[in-house]
Amino acid sequence: MFDNARFDNPRVRGLYTSLSDGWVYMNAATDPQLPERVSGAVSRAFRSAPLAAPIEENHGEHSRAASPGTRIGESHIKSARVAIADLVGARPEHVILGSSRTQLINQLAESLSHRLRLGRQVVLSRVDDGANIDPWLRAADLYGADVRWAEADLSTGVLPAWQYTELVSPETAVVAVAAANEHVGTVTDVAAIGRTVHAKSDGIFVVDANAVAPFHVIDIADLGADVLALDVATIGGPSIGALVFRSVELMGELFPHPPRQSRARAAARFGAHKDVAPGPGGLALRGAVHPSVERAREWLELGGLSEGLLGGVSAAVDHLADLASDAEGDSLRGTRRRRLRGGLPLAEDYVHGLARMVVDGLHGLPGAHVIGLEGEYEEHFDYDSVERIPRLSFFIDGVPAEAVHARLFAQGVVTSVIPPGDSELLEQMGVFESSTGAVCVGLSVHNTVGDVNRLLRAVASLR
């Protein structure tokens, strides 16, 4: 029996004006819907970014008034860093911003050439998508490092953490892993892998948290990550990527020298010099930057970035923090980080309930196969047999994935297609040997039981 008593889905649906077009959107894995507060914030940010910021009086020795001529757009950069820091349990000065996590991981891999030389190793995993695989493969090939692979359990899609005790060695320079697979939904024991990495090497542990960001309370320290990557779009925000570093000390270690001056000038145009750094007594002073942070931004924050888009980052994290209500139906109170901790588990439980309905329904349809939830002899696994996020993929015997997708679309249900070459994990699991692809169902907090029933009726009509 599906129980949503602790999550006010009608209220949450009202936060998405895009749902009024009549479509059932189950493609959150690739194209999440934007809440109205995010689109409104972006619109206001584009209008206000070039305007001069008002001059406020200076109060106290540890603060400084804005300089004359400061634009409002510069505050959007600062608020975006603060929002990402709240989302992952970090400090704003540890946040690097870019156009996407793919671009940022690319830049990170290129900038670590001194670590990826001959004799060093890079450890990658099959559960990651291309954003956290391809940049490291290119960098390893260019600079001479060897690549080692962590393999998934091909029956479930889970990435076992125990294998890293053999894969990681003193020569390991980088270990990159996804916190969850975006198509199958299986969650990786990142903390266990992180403990192994730090115990056996001085390698950098890079975690792609993109798939778990809409559902899990992320804490970079608990995960043991040195660098954490995500796209704000995955939580219903604008197309902005972020890298979050564990500490300023790590930033200084990874970037001991500034890049070429031309890169420094490009980064300066993005406003890298305007943020927070330790002041007298360890307190923060506005307008200054720790040298290690500045060097990291000069290396990674290349080119310009729309301050209008940055204006929607804080609204996206606020939306995530305000999804759930307390027992009386009132919004949760406290800091944004506290509201994330209190509300996200309730939202995740609700979406898990919908995902269980989808899995149970597909298991009851002849010829339907839910990837990672069936054994060798087509016995069905329980949805909760492994830790997962509410994402799943399936295929139908004898029916091309494009045809399934088209039938769903004709019935008003929007899903995603995973073609051959788009998923290393599905390739290893043999999905593309028996099918032309798979259909990915990306559930979100705005979906309903009615949406699930509509999906299942459309799939059933194919047989």
For the regions a protein language model found, what residue spans apply to each?
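Pyridoxal 5′-phosphate
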Residues: 1-463
